[in-house]
């Protein structure tokens, strides 16, 4: 295997598992089981080390387990201390390059769990003064994985990592919301035409439009934050299927307590370990919340592309910052590339949500072996959403400018002004005016005076666009 970030001396050590022996480069902290996983799974080419939060969470879980096993007299204190120190190094970002298995893997996450077990065991052996591969001093299964199964250690680490990742996602979202609020305030005095079904509707301000985007996204911070709490319930101590085989009766509570201290999260034991080991409901809920955010971001970006269309034959109400030439054949063309890329991220997130749904449905009996693809999709979606929102905020929203005269001219030329006459002239008369304006090209203002339906003074008050962007009492009342 060629991991270019790990320099090799050519020296090797020999390791074995139930399938036989294998030569392992001396610089690798992972061992034979990880090597077999690397050989088997050339799938996504996205390794565990692409998501540092997952490595950090695996270290949390292994440290909590070691502390609980030590306290219960199941693990030699010296070995426990070495494991704890190795985990602390992982949490500090060391040895990330050693987490090399593909995120998409068979085995319900066993390859991920063993990658962590082997790296921690080999580093712990070094801290104890021994060489990598001398498993009698610290064994990946007998010591690092003591009282655990992949089926409780892996999903617990995933949940912890997802909480931290969602916190970053929400922070990025809040910054984007603030950017929309800032533009809403900046554009608060700019009158423009609102549209429904892409047809002229009634006046509004450009600021109201951007404030609506901010409000729309604010709902998602609340939903993501509430949804995140589902991940506080963990199944450490469930071991293989939730019955707790090979775990001390006090292990689950003690390990969960230590994990609360290590992570600072309000983690709790699942009330039914068998249900918690097989259930993926929290993943479905979180994926759905990510999809909902993606859909809203995509809709907003659709609007930005429409509002900036032109510059001479489109709406041209706003200008997006020009970021790169838009065409290899059309000189001078600049495209809305940033909203476009956010659209594409949204499509990917929506697709990932479908994958999570199908993989969750595919669970059988006491375990869902499809969790690796669920985990891959969730972390990929979060990563892409964070990057997309940061890019949109920094390179697009912050630099948007308004074409105020274009916006105002469209309002005064619009037949949509006639809506304001409904309370005074009635729907049928207003409809007649709209039809005549469309046929003759005359303005609504001129036609009302021509037909002597209202005085000029009263008409001016009614059709003043600034008076049409908020609820107000009928003039004269």
Give the location of each predicted region.
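Conserved, well-structured ligand/cofactor-binding cores
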Residues: 1-477
């Amino acid at each position: 295997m060629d991991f270019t970030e790990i320099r090799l001396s050519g020296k090797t050590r020999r390791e074995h598992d139930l399938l036989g022996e294998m030569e392992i480069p001396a610089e690798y902290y992972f061992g034979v089981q990880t090597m077999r996983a690397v050989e088997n799974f050339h799938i996504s080419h996205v390794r565990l080390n692409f998501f540092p939060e997952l490595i950090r969470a695996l270290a949390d879980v292994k440290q909590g387990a070691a502390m609980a096993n030590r306290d219960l007299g199941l693990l030699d204190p010296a070995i426990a201390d070495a494991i704890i120190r190795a985990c602390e190094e992982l949490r500090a970002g060391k040895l990330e390059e050693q987490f090399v298995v593909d995120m998409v893997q068979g085995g319900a996450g066993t390859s991920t769990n063993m990658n962590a077990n082997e790296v921690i065991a080999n580093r712990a052996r070094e801290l104890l003064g021994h060489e990598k591969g001398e498993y009698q001093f610290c064994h990946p299964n007998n010591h690092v994985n003591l009282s655990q199964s992949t089926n409780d250690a892996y999903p617990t680490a995933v949940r912890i990592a997802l909480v931290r990742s969602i916190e970053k996602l929400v922070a990025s979202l809040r910054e984007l919301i603030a950017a929309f609020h800032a533009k809403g305030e900046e554009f608060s005095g700019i009158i423009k035409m609102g549209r429904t079904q892409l047809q002229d509707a009634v006046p509004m301000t450009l600021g109201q439009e951007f404030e609506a985007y901010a409000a729309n996204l604010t709902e998602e911070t609340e939903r993501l934050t509430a949804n995140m709490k589902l991940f506080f319930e963990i199944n450490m101590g469930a071991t293989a299927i939730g019955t707790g085989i090979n775990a001390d009766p006090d292990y689950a509570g003690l390990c969960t307590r230590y994990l609360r201290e290590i992570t600072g999260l309000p983690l709790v034991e699942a009330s039914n370990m068998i249900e918690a080991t097989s259930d993926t409901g929290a993943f479905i809920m979180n994926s759905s919340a990510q999809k909902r955010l993606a859909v809203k971001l995509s809709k907003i970006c659709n609007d930005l592309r429409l509002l900036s269309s032109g510059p001479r034959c489109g709406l041209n109400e706003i200008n997006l910052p020009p970021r790169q030439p838009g065409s290899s054949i059309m000189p001078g063309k600049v495209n809305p590339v940033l909203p476009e890329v956010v659209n594409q991220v949204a499509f990917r997130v929506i697709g990932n949500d479908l994958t999570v749904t199908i993989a969750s449905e595919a669970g059988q009996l006491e375990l869902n072996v499809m969790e690796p693809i669920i985990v891959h999709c969730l972390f990929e979606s979060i990563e892409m959403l964070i990057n997309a929102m940061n890019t949109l905020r920094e390179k697009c929203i912050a630099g948007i400018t308004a074409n105020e005269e274009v916006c105002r001219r469209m309002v005064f030329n619009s037949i949509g002004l006639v809506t304001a006459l409904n309370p005074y002239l009635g729907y049928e008369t207003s409809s007649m005016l709209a039809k005549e304006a469309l046929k003759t090209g005359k303005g609504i203002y001129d036609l009302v005076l021509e037909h002597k339906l209202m005085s000029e003074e009263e008409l001016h008050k009614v059709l003043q666009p600034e008076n049409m962007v908020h609820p107000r009492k009928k003039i004269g009342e």
